[in-house]
Amino acid sequence: MANSKSAKKRALQSEKRRQHNASRRSMLRTYVKKVIAAIRAGDHKTATEAFAAAQPIVDRMATKGLIHKNKAARHKARLNAKIKALVA
């Protein structure tokens, strides 16, 4: 347990940040899951719309440091490839 005043403050800040990041991470996963669900349903139009909504969220989370930029790029590339495969 934190003993000094500054350590207590850091512990509080850390917990607050953890909760905020957990919320953001959950939101990110929800957007990605919506795209995956539309792909599994075989609905190209819905998948494209869901991907268009998810793409800026993924980019924003990478910018904020919640996920690595390469992971964001990987998410977008794989989802986009699966959407394009629906048409072919």
Swiss-Prot record:
GO terms for cellular component: cytosol; small ribosomal subunit. SUPFAM superfamilies: Ribosomal protein S20. GO terms for molecular function: small ribosomal subunit rRNA binding; structural constituent of ribosome. Keywords: Ribonucleoprotein, Ribosomal protein, RNA-binding, rRNA-binding. The keyword Transferase does not apply. One of its GO terms (biological process) is translation. Residues 1-27 are annotated as: Disordered. Belongs to the bacterial ribosomal protein bS20 family. Binds directly to 16S ribosomal RNA. This is Small ribosomal subunit protein bS20. The gene is rpsT.
